[in-house]
Amino acid sequence: MTDQRRNVYFFHKQDQETNEQARSLTQLAEEHGFTVVNQHSDANIIASIGGDGTFLQAVRKTNFRDDCLYVGITKKGKAHLYCDFHSDEREKMVDAMTFEQIEVRKYPLIEVTVDQASPFHCLNEVSIRSSIIKTFVMDVLIDDLHFETFRGDGMIISTPTGSTAYNKSVAGAVVDPLLPCMQVSELASLNNNTYRTLGSPFVLSSDRKLTLRVVQDGNEHPIIGLDNEALSTRNVKTIEIKLSNKKIKTVKLKDNSFWEKVKRTFL
């Protein structure tokens, strides 16, 4: 698997501690026949040094490439869902690569189109929230058919791997990443005798399209979060969300499954 992939790009924060770890990892990579490159466009392996947040940034800043492998390396021995390697476990990294103790997982992306502009991609989730202290109103359509009119603080639409992040904090379900789907979770929905929403998360298959039409009532400048970045505030009328045909490939240890990571992180 790695025989044809020898060009490595390290993505990391520019602080003294991380720079030292990057230099150490660069030396390790070069000792084992890899070439460390300065531009991510020249790489076929992109390794992030940090936590899950750094991994998300690495994927976004390198344009969600589907022609390379992404590797998560954490700086400290804490549990991370996207990072299978620790920077202080050099021998384990070498053994994993040498003896093929790794496998490649393909993770789906969410594709977000705002008012028919160029689409954005997300690995974890897209969130749409009110930017002012006022109930946010959206018409929710599934495959262009009206499903409900949402009133509340906003919504989160997550991938299976993203289901353990923001989505879980609002009582969304944790979804197996082998299921190609996206989950829709509400933020403080308004439910009474006059207004009604489903009131629970729901899951859409990879063939479905979700459309959110923002009611133009003075609250049409929502905060749109794309993973751990915010989209510039703008007047928004329609947001279309679907599971992208594009996927990223990540390297994971064979003995470190998604559910083992979930158990280690939350239980």
From Swiss-Prot:
EC number of the protein: 2.7.1.23
Cofactor(s) essential for the protein: a divalent metal cation
Pfam family, one: NAD_kinase_C
Chief place where the protein resides: cytoplasm
UniProt keyword list: ATP-binding, Cytoplasm, Kinase, NAD, NADP, Nucleotide-binding, Transferase
Compartments it resides in: Cytoplasm
Catalysed reactions listed for this entry: NAD(+) + ATP = ADP + NADP(+) + H(+)
Active-site residues annotated for this sequence: D52 (proton acceptor)
Binding site for NAD(+): D52, G53, N124, E125, R151, D153, T164, A165, Y166, N167, K168, S169, A188
Cellular component terms (Gene Ontology): cytoplasm
Annotated GO MF terms: ATP binding; metal ion binding; NAD binding; NAD+ kinase activity
Domain of life: Bacteria
GO biological process terms held by the UniProt record: NAD metabolic process; NADP biosynthetic process
NCBIfam families, sorted: PRK03501.1 (NF002902), PRK04885.1 (NF003424)
Family: Belongs to the NAD kinase family.
Function summary: Involved in the regulation of the intracellular balance of NAD and NADP, and is a key enzyme in the biosynthesis of NADP. Catalyzes specifically the phosphorylation on 2'-hydroxyl of the adenosine moiety of NAD to yield NADP.
Descriptive protein name: NAD kinase 2
The species this protein was found in: Bacillus subtilis (strain 168)
